[in-house]
Amino acid sequence: MELNSIKPAEGAKHAKRRVGRGIGSGLGKTAGRGHKGQKSRSGGYHKVGFEGGQMPLQRRLPKRGFKSHLLKFNAEVTLSTLEQLGLAEVDLAALKSAGVVGQLAKVVKVIKSGELTKAVKLNGIGATAGAKAAIEAAGGSLA
């Protein structure tokens, strides 16, 4: 067998039905669209989700919750991330330059996730109670 000799199975492919080409074809005149009505017109169809004037599902259901616009300014850093950085002093600028937090971040908080063995001094960065205890246990401090 060769790639240029591969062909589809017999009867697997058929020509597209040409509509609107005379009554002898069986699909002339109305071209399978029936008589009159919105769906028979060119360009005539309803928008997605339209239910014939009934209140559509996406408007029947209530809105729920909200998304805070302040999230992009807040960031969190784990203890394991601080461990990987290997810096003695960590501040917002150091985290941004290392690519740990986004450039828009204004507030950073350390959360207790992972282990910390190196002493790290945090400048202008908050920490949860558990993270603070872990940092101090490793010989670090918060300023």
UniProtKB/Swiss-Prot annotation:
Pfam families: Ribosomal_L27A. The keyword RNA-binding applies. Keywords: Ribonucleoprotein, Ribosomal protein, RNA-binding, rRNA-binding. InterPro entries: Ribosomal_uL15, Ribosomal_uL15/eL18, Ribosomal_uL15/eL18_sf, Ribosomal_uL15_bac-type. GO terms for biological process: translation. Residues 1-54 are annotated as: Disordered. Residues 21-31 have a biased composition (Gly residues). Belongs to the universal ribosomal protein uL15 family. Binds to the 23S rRNA. This is Large ribosomal subunit protein uL15. It comes from Paracidovorax citrulli (strain AAC00-1) (Acidovorax citrulli). The lineage of its organism: Bacteria, Pseudomonadati, Pseudomonadota, Betaproteobacteria, Burkholderiales. The gene is rplO.
